[in-house]
Amino acid sequence: MMVSHERRVLFVHVQKTGGSTIDRMLEEAIPDVTYLQGLRGGRHARLAPALKAHPELKEYFIFGFVRNPWARMYSWYAMMRRAETQAAEGNAKAAKQLAKNRLWKRVLPNYPDFESFVLRGPNEQRELRRAQITYLRGQGRRADFIGRQENFDADLQKVWDRIGLEWPGESLKVNTGPSADYRQHYTDEMRDKVAEVFAKDLKRFKYEF
C-alpha cells in the first residue's frame, strides 16, 4: 500500500493484479510517495485496517486493481514456483524473496502442484481465500476507482489523469511472467473451487472462467 500526501492518493495493492508495476511507476512519478508502514500485510495491507489506523486517509483518492480470479490463482502459483526455480539456480533476488515471504514458505513445500494449491490452499491459507473486494473497502469507505488487470494501461491512465500526472504512453513491465492460457491448467473441480472461494469477486466484477 502506497500513499502520497502531496497528491492525496492511496494505492491498495491486491496481489497479482499488476501492483508491482504501479508501485514502481508511482515512485518514479511522485517524489513523496512511500509505503504506508505498520500495517499487517505490508505492501498488501487491506483498506479497512489502513483507514482505522489513519482515518485522515478517508479523504484521499483511493484506488486499486483486480483480476480474473482463475487467472490470478494460476499466476500466483506460477510466480512462486518460478522464484523457487530461480533461487535454486543461484538468483540472489529470488532467494531473498523466498526467505522473507511467509506465505511462499508455507505454500511451496505443502502444495506440490497447482491442483493441490487450488483445492486445498484456500482452506488452509487465509491469504489464498480472501476475496479481492475485501482489500478495497472498509471503515465505511470503498475505493474510488477499481481498475482491471485485463485493461491495465487504459485503466491506469485514468488514475494518472485523476491525480494530475502525465501518462508516459505505456506502463512499465515489472514481475511479469510468461503469458499462458490459465484455463488449460484447470479441471472442472478446480474451476468450481475458485468460483466458490471468490464468489464475492465474481458477483461484483462479473468475471467468467
Per-range role (PLM):
Residues 1-209:
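Membrane-interface amphipathic segments in extracytoplasmic regions
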